[in-house]
């Protein structure tokens, strides 16, 4: 069958159809692939936009909201709020400044804050509200507590019993050399010195501490015991002098 279009090997419709189909079939996957990538990119951008919006909302939710300033009715007729060009926000700002500058309002705020701290502290253990009362009660208990008085009484009884049961330790603790004008002599401390010493007991130790004159006068029994111990010690000891600069002690 002779062709109607010379120079064409095959039917042009078929070739065009095949070429069209081939070109269409070749270009269709490219268009679908590009469209899919574009949709994917759009979805990613939309997701980023949504996540950014959610993060912004969360940040705004976490931040503290500024309290709205309400203009009281008593200040609506104030001269500084009657300016026609003032906006509502400017009027609220001026109202807040006027409240801050007002001394009575400051006193009210201070009183409210004080009452809040007072009630908040009273709910605890009473450290803020009754601090002075606790301190005074502790001081009075320390001064007049029966346990403290009983402990002092036991310490005094222990000191007296130790003084009566161990005279040798007391004698040796009271004995010390004295220097006179004539030369070196061996003897005991003066009577006033012995009176000003008081015996205290600690676990495993016995030592002397100076006591004021009032305390020594208020305890005549201890003084008499010390004097008796000194007399006994002096009776049991004799001093022999050998020359002006030598002395020996015999018991």
Curated annotation (Swiss-Prot):
Tree of life domain: Eukaryota
Q: Cite the Pfam families for this sequence.
A: FAM216B
The record's section on InterPro entries has: FAM216 (IPR029373)
Annotated region (Disordered) at 1-41
Family of this protein:
Belongs to the FAM216 family.
Q: What is this protein called?
A: Protein FAM216A
């Amino acid at each position: 069958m002779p062709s109607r279009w010379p120079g064409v090997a095959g039917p042009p419709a078929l070739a065009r159809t095949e070429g069209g189909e081939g070109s269409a079939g070749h270009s269709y996957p490219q268009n679908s692939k590009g469209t899919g990538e574009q949709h994917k990119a759009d979805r990613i951008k939309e997701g980023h936009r949504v996540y950014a919006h959610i993060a912004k909302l969360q940040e705004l939710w976490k931040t503290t909201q500024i309290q709205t300033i309400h203009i009281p009715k008593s200040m609506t007729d104030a001269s500084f709020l009657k300016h026609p060009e003032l906006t509502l926000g400017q009027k609220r700002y001026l109202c807040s400044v006027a409240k801050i500058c007002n001394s009575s309002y400051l006193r009210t705020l201070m009183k409210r804050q004080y009452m809040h701290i007072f009630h908040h502290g009273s709910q605890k253990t009473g450290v803020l509200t009754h601090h002075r009362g606790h301190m005074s009660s502790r001081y009075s208990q320390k001064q007049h507590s029966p346990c403290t008085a009983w402990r002092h009484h036991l310490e005094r009884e222990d000191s007296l019993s130790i003084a009566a049961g161990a005279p040798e330790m007391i004698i040796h603790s009271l004995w010390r050399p004295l220097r006179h004008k004539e030369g070196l002599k061996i003897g005991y401390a003066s009577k006033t010195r012995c009176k000003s010493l008081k015996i205290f007991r600690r676990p495993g130790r016995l030592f002397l501490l100076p006591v004021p004159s009032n305390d020594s006068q208020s305890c005549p029994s201890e003084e008499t015991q010390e004097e008796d111990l000194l007399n006994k010690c002096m009776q049991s000891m004799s001093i022999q002098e050998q020359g002006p600069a030598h002395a020996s002690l015999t018991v």
